[in-house]
């Protein structure tokens, strides 16, 4: 009835100064709280449980969504359940109590149920949404909710691991006892580890039955749990200890050199690619590295990597410095300088071929590429020198050291057209003068003939 009255007239339920004394919500910063807070705590899910329909999940309750808790739910305490009866029963229980391999007075289902209650009971009891005494109601609601179903999933995972552990123990028979320990069994040690300390975690060898190799340690450590699943590791360690120190072939437990992968070969090929005039040459080392690999490593050994030597051919670039002041004319013509450069480059290439050892196809390809790059650079230098020579022939750009190539071409075209026009003009004048000369010669001849 109070709820209906509040919904019909919300203003009457919210005076100016409202103060609720709720022990769960300490909101000092908010003097006016929403009207849907209740002074008394009521078990909403307990009322819904009595109905015939399935109660909604915790995340579907619209009223519980607006509850502003001071802090989120705390993480489950691992020390709170150490003294519970189920924990003591599991810790003191030894699966190998009987000779027939049974679980003593407890069946397999009872063992899994005790471990499930041990791992998931405290976490569920600490949640703020359910009654800790109502276990059936928790199972009906919490498992269906995506927010709280992690508890049941964790309990199911632990149950599956314990079942697989017991099955492996029964299949393998009696495990090999570890060195230095008498009659300790793997199962009893595993259950004793649960009651050792809350900060300790489950041994990884229980979850991962196969031993994990660590490259940093010289040899793996033998644990009581790992011997139950890897009986061959104990024999390998014992054989390694029994072998003398001076044996020529020691037992190699780990592979120091990783095998060559496809990515490594691709990187080597990319390094061998040559850009512009930089050539790459492979030199075989005088002595090959001998890598001794163990038979257990699978025969993977990295091939000897020949060092890559970068050689830069001496090419006369004659790059023009545009920022330099105007210099004097070159001593040698461009044609003579080109002959000297080409002769020097070809002589250097021939010397490299004579001094080198017999080459493979890759080395010959590198030589061809290097020769092509040298000739291409020489062609570019000749083209640059021709531009400079053309610039020196143009009167307007004769003293301009920073003239670009486009301006040189435009000015050269205009200058050529003007020179051609001047040539035509001079040719026509020459013809006129030649005719005038012919006329004067004829007149002079006539005057000589007329005089006695």
Swiss-Prot record:
It holds the Pfam family HLH. InterPro entries: bHLH_dom (IPR011598), HLH_DNA-bd_sf (IPR036638), Myc-LZ (IPR003327), Myc_transcription_factors (IPR050433), Tscrpt_reg_Myc (IPR002418), Tscrpt_reg_Myc_N (IPR012682). Glycans are attached at residue 71. Residues 223-250 have a biased composition (Low complexity). Residues 264-276 have a biased composition (Acidic residues). Alternative translation initiation from an upstream, in-frame non-ATG (CTG) codon or a downstream ATG start site results in the production of 2 isoforms with distinct N-termini, shown in this entry as isoform 2 and isoform 1, respectively. This is Myc proto-oncogene protein. The gene is MYC.
């Amino acid at each position: 009835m109070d709820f209906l009255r509040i919904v019909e007239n919300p203003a009457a339920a919210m005076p100016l100064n409202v103060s609720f004394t709720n022990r769960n919500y300490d909101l000092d910063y908010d003097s006016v709280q929403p009207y849907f807070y209740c002074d008394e705590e009521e078990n909403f899910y307990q009322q819904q449980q009595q109905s015939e329909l399935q109660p909604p999940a915790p995340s579907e309750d619209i009223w519980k969504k607006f509850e502003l808790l001071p802090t989120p739910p705390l993480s489950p305490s691992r020390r709170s359940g150490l003294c519970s009866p189920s924990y003591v029963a599991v810790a003191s229980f030894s699966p190998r109590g009987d000779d027939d391999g049974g679980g003593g007075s407890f069946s397999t289902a009872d063992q899994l149920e005790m471990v499930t209650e041990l791992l998931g009971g405290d976490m569920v009891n600490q949640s703020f949404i359910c009654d800790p005494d109502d276990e059936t109601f928790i199972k009906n609601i919490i498992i269906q909710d995506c927010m709280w179903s992690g508890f049941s999933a964790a309990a199911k995972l632990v149950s599956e691991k314990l079942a697989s552990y017991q099955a492996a123990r029964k299949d393998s028979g009696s495990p090999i006892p570890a060195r230095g320990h008498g009659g300790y069994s793997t199962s009893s040690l595993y259950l004793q580890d649960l009651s050792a300390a809350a900060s300790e975690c489950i041994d990884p060898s229980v979850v991962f039955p196969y031993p994990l190799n660590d490259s940093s340690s010289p040899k793996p450590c033998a644990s009581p749990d790992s011997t139950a699943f890897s009986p061959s590791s104990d024999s390998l360690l014992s054989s390694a200890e029994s072998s003398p120190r001076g044996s020529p072939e020691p037992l190699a437990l780990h592979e120091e050199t990783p095998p060559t992968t496809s990515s490594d070969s691709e990187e080597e090929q990319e390094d061998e690619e040559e850009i512009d005039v930089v050539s790459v040459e492979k030199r075989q080392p005088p002595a090959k590295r001998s890598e001794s690999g163990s038979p257990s490593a699978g025969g993977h050994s990295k091939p000897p990597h020949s060092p890559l030597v970068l050689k830069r051919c001496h090419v006369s670039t004659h790059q023009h410095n545009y920022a330099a002041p105007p210099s004097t004319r070159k001593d040698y013509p461009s044609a003579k300088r080109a002959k000297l450069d080409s002769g020097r480059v070809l002589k250097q290439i021939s010397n490299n071929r004579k001094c080198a050892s017999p080459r493979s196809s890759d080395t010959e390809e590198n030589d061809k590429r290097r020769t092509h790059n040298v000739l291409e650079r020489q062609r570019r230098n000749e083209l640059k020198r021709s531009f400079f020579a053309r610039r020196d022939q143009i009167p307007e750009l004769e003293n301009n050291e920073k003239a670009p190539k486009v301006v040189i071409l435009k000015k050269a075209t205009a200058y050529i057209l003007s020179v051609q026009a001047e040539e035509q003009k001079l040719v026509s004048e020459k013809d006129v003068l030649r005719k005038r000369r012919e006329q004067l010669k004829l007149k002079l001849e006539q005057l000589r003939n007329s005089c006695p």
